[in-house]
Structure formats: C-alpha cells, structure tokens
Amino acid sequence: MARHVTWRAGGRARTFFHPADLDDLAAFLAGLPGGEPVLFLGLGSNLLVRDGGFAGAVVFTHRALKGIEAAPPLGPKLVVVAGAGVPAPHLARFVARHGGGGAEWMAGVPGTVGGALAMNAGCYGGETWKHVVSVRTIDRRGTVRTRTAADYEIGYRHVASRHGAEEWFVGATFAFDAGDEAAAMAAMKALLVKRVASQPLNLPNAGSVFRNPPGDHAARLIETCGLKGFAVGAAQVSTKHANFIVNLGGASAADIESVIAHVQATVKSRTGVELVREVRIVGSAGGVDAGAAP
C-alpha cells in the first residue's frame, strides 16, 4: 500500500480492484465473501495502513468514478454532479469555470470527492457538506441509493450514517453560489501559495493529522509542547507545520503511529487536551481493519 497512500508507508493489501465503471463496482461488491473488509481509496491522503497490511479488498475510485458535469441550476445556484473519484481541486476549478463560487478552498484539499464526503473535509473556512444537495452510495450488495444530509450525522471532520448500513460514497450533487471565474481563480492561486508556504509539501505526508479542538488549533498545542521535530525512525513531526507528520525517507507505518501516539500523550499530559486523529488507521500485524477510532 505504500505506493498508494501519500505517507508512502504501509503493508500490502490482499486484493486490489480498479472498477471500470459503477456497474463493474456493483458486481464486484456483490461477489465478495460476507464480512470481507472493504476499503475505498482515492488519492491515498488522510490514511495510514499498518505494516501488516490490509486483509481485505481495496477499491480504487480515482479512475472510474471521475465523471463531473453541470446540472440544471437550483435557482441562482450552480449545480454540479461529481463522482467520488474526482480530485477536490478539479471540482474547485470546474465550479469556477462554470461561474460558481465558494469552492475555492477545495483547491487545497489533497484528496477526492469521496474522501471529502466521508470526513466532511474542509479548510480555510469551507466544509464539504455545506454544498451537498444529495449523495449516491453503494452497499455490499451493489445497490446504489440516493441520500441526503438528513441521513447522516454531520460535524467537524465527522460524518456518520443514521441508518447504520455499510455504504460507500460513489458520487454527489453539489450546489454553489454564483461567482466570478477570475476572482475564484485568483483566490485559489492565493490559497495554494499560502499552502506551499505553510505546509511540508516537499515530503510525504497525509495532511493534517489531528482535528482542531474547540477554540484552538492542534498545531499550536503541539508546538507549545515542544514537539516540532520529534521523530521515531524516519517519521517526524514537521518543523514547518506541527500538525503534519512527514516521512523523511523509509519510515514505517509503525514509526508514524508511534509519533502520533507520543504527540497525543504529551499534549494530553501537558495541556489536558485530548487530540483526536483526523487520519484513519487501518490494518494491523495480522491485517485486520482497525477502523477509525481516535
């Protein structure tokens, strides 16, 4: 999995699947053994696969589920339908070029629409689900459904199904306010300049590791505890942005997870604040999905 996640670390998966289209994906899921762990993967950010690998099926969305188109407007709003495999920056540019506004922040998200939906990705004041009209999901039987925000518990970097079924996002319909293309493109350029200046984009990383606690910033707390530069093996708390853990070259998933645990324990003991992971960790020495617990 190291080649497929942005941390460039982690063990092997039992099965890889690149669906040709949604029908192909439905047939694949329907044919899986009951209880087979399934991991949907876009660009591989926000994810750590343990060194023992993932004992299940990894489904890649970025090749097949990449359609994007403008739909009939909702009043003055631009409506865009995008597949789960569409990179978030691509969606941001599409919205701008079609006269929409409010998606500029997505230019700084290093993931896909599917990943953004799954965690309510956001930055620079924007959040994914603020723009969602509806989503399309697929379950283990290959059944595709249309759902709305009412079907989910949505919060800061948190999305949970209210109906309890195991489903994955395959696309969404978004609505955006009217905007100006030139202004939107300029705003995206400015955000990207800011991102390059403040984040360690020259080294493998997964994006922000921890959620910001209410009224504070994880990076500030980590830096206050003197943890910038702390390392285990080749995994290091970035000296450029404390809420990033970088792979200096050859880091194992265990190295990265050890840094995460040390940061959480240190911040908790010194400040009383319990940092909650934003990144998902899957697998184990035996390859069993660890889920998304903090």
Which residues are covered by each model-predicted region?
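Gly/Ser/Thr-rich helix-start
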Residues: G11-R12, L43-S45, F54-A57, V86, ...
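Phosphate/pyrophosphate- and phosphate-bearing ligand-binding catalytic cores of soluble enzymes
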Residues: R3-A9, L47, I138-P294
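Structural signature of FAD isoalloxazine-binding scaffolds in flavoprotein oxidoreductases
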Residues: G10, H18-L22, L48-K66, A118-T148, ...
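Short N-terminal helix-initiation segments at or just after the protein's N-terminus
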Residues: V79-V81, G108-L117, Y156, A183-L191
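Anion-binding (especially nucleotide phosphate/pyrophosphate-binding) glycine-rich loop
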Residues: A2-V113
